[in-house]
Curated annotation (Swiss-Prot):
Keywords: ATP-binding, Chaperone, Coiled coil, Cytoplasm, Nucleotide-binding, Repeat, Stress response. ATP 1 binds at residues 208-215. Residues 85-148 are annotated as: Repeat 2. ATP 2 binds at residues 611-618. CDD domains: AAA (cd00009), RecA-like_ClpB_Hsp104-like (cd19499). It comes from Nostoc sp. (strain PCC 7120 / SAG 25.82 / UTEX 2576). It is found in: Cytoplasm. The gene is clpB2. This is Chaperone protein ClpB 2. Homohexamer. The oligomerization is ATP-dependent.
Amino acid sequence: MQPTNPNQFTEKAWEAIAHTPEIAKQHQQQQIESEHLMKALLEQDGLASGILTKAGVNLQKISDRTEQYIQRQPKVSGNSTSVYLGRSLDTLLDRAEAHRKDFQDEYISIEHLLLAYPKDDRFGKGLFQEFALDESKLKNIIKQVRGSQTVTDQNPEGKYQSLEKYGRDLTEAARKGQLDPVIGRDDEIRRTIQILSRRTKNNPVLIGEPGVGKTAIAEGLAQRIVAGDVPQSLKDRKLISLDMGAMIAGAKFRGEFEERLKAVLKEVTESGGNIVLFIDEIHTVVGAGATQGAMDAGNLLKPMLARGELRCIGATTLDEYRKYIEKDAALERRFQQVYVDQPSVEDTISILRGLKERYEVHHGVKISDSSLVAAATLSSRYISDRFLPDKAIDLVDEAAARLKMEITSKPEELDEIDRKILQLEMEKLSLQKESDAASRERLERLEKELADLKEEQRTLNTQWQSEKDVINKLQSVKEEIDKVNLEIQQAERNYDLNRAAELKYGNLTDLHRRLEATERELSQTQGTGKSLLREEVTEADIAEIISKWTGIPISKLVESEKEKLLHLEDELHHRVIGQDEAVTAVADAIQRSRAGLADPNRPTASFVFLGPTGVGKTELAKALASYMFDTEDALVRIDMSEYMEKHAVSRLIGAPPGYVGYEEGGQLTETIRRRPYAVILFDEIEKAHPDVFNIFLQILDDGRVTDAQGHTVDFKNTIIIMTSNIGSQYILDIAGDNSRYDEMRHRVMEAMRNSFRPEFLNRIDEVIIFHSLDKKELRQIVQLQVERLKARLDDRKISLRLSDVALDFLAEVGYDPVFGARPLKRAIQRELETQIAKAILRGEFNDGDTIFVDVQNERLSFSRLPVEVFSS
């Protein structure tokens, strides 16, 4: 048979035949024989390889034998490029045609070509005998692969074993112990089994938020099927997870995707209810593969789902269910909903305890029970935009991975010594070139130091290696225990009770003894001195990971805050001068809240700061952020003068749907979602439009607000401060006259009531009035500002000293009761900082000098102090 007509062959078969002349030319041969076709088939990595692998043939070996046979054939030298068909290939194609007729196929396919080889006297017969393959064995394997399919088009290979190609057998994975244990979720699994046992519409769809464990329920069902813990209707069934991505990938031509899907569905229905299909992210089925006028995958599924021919479990999130499946009422009615809710913190702890062993074996570390409790409680409290148990499992996983990374990388102490040795070695090399006495003396000292360091390095290296070896030994023992437990389960499933008992009371007991001995060895190794490696995940590790995720300082999560809260007032007094009443009121409110006496559903504290400009309102907010949350970055400052129009409220919580900027979220809500622990400063609130205050009502009362995209943003851990200049003229009127304080407070509060609505004022914890500053307080502020300048000069190793007269001079120059401390800042910049900068640039002061500042002729004078004066 001359292979001249590609229409007689399937695409893959013709591809292999068309490749044979190329192979012959590569080997300088003019005659194309059956061995060239075999090489082409093996290089294809398609159906031929699959059939031979199923027959137990080593593909590498058969490929090598074919190559060796080709190499032994005569070669033709010269420039001739013509090749012609050999007799063996001609007769092989005739036999393939005969097999096609036997199978009642329309085209010659790969399997027909393979079946023709056992009778190929030239090459195939000997090759197949060597690998113990005959025609009947090949036919049986081909029937297994093809099932009931016949070759009716030129691409039949895509439909063979389509479930194997586009699906993952979850029951097989459960049998091999590849799935994580599923703890709890009994109600959801029972309801799923109940729906699967119906006669028609036996298709449950698991819907719930991302990360609550929908896929885990399907895996739990697979584990129950394997354990036989299911009703008769599901006994010995296969649960296969369909990979929609693999089905769509590479479907180049119109209808190819539908063809693949039909092949999968045909295989499922022909199994006679033996296969249950699981489609994760089932919303991808709606609209998949639909081009102009073509049917989508959802419509192909509908008839089978309604008749009960196909048992299918779907899983999707609430948003996607609403967006895709609810729109298609015909598809929705074929699925029965199983709602999967987020587990409670207690249930999450149980889930983590069940998974603990898996993670310990994978990472080779120990995970303490307290760290599991911390992961569940802290993630529930601080990570509000994700769901349990997923976020808690992620925390434990990342903390264990971080610890594993520490174990495998060099300890910090050892790394420091290595770097020090390297530095000294380089110094030694340069000193060896010098011949003076000082250099030789330094060289001797250096060599002694090097010898000591190398000795310490050797000791630490030995300790690190021994600790690492024991930890690795621990991991391998745990892995063996895991394997033996899996073997015990398999033996019990097969009712091989002798084997199960032998493993349980023999191998497993020995392994547990080895585990205890290794743990003792580790504690002895680490007990000899300071341990270099930790092998247990603790609460602190979990807290550190949460801190990295959310930006919440670790001290908030782990350390006791009592000390911090007790010293809060003192700390604020250091930074905010002259506002004792304000500082005390703020500290009291926060201490009340943190001690658990305040309402937990409201912000930690909310204040309105009233007072003239420059008296420390913003400074107190900064000091509070810095002390409570360890960084001034925790201060979220929103200037209310930018919210003077009614529509500006959309900038705080995000633009409504349909408006430009809807996707971006709001300035306030997005910031607090990313950093839930913050001090929020609304500056100059009297300048905002009255409608903007409506948003404050729910923040101050319920501690939460819903943004334009429907996310609930939690304000319960924030401290809210609003500043205003309302009534500042009354405060300035009584500057220094404490006898009129009550009268002034009454007038300021009256001004507040005239400007703001009662429902807003009623929700604020405290209205705090700031006094104007007098000269004595300004002098203290001068000292504070000078301390900051000293810190900046420290970088240049320059010291700064000011006489009392100089401090008084700066306080006098910067005193302005109307503008508070701001003119003082400008005076210090003008009189002190600028003059020092100019003197340094002129070269009057150098690094390491001490500058003494005094007053001469009603101006500041600058002089260099001798070192001995300073040291005395």
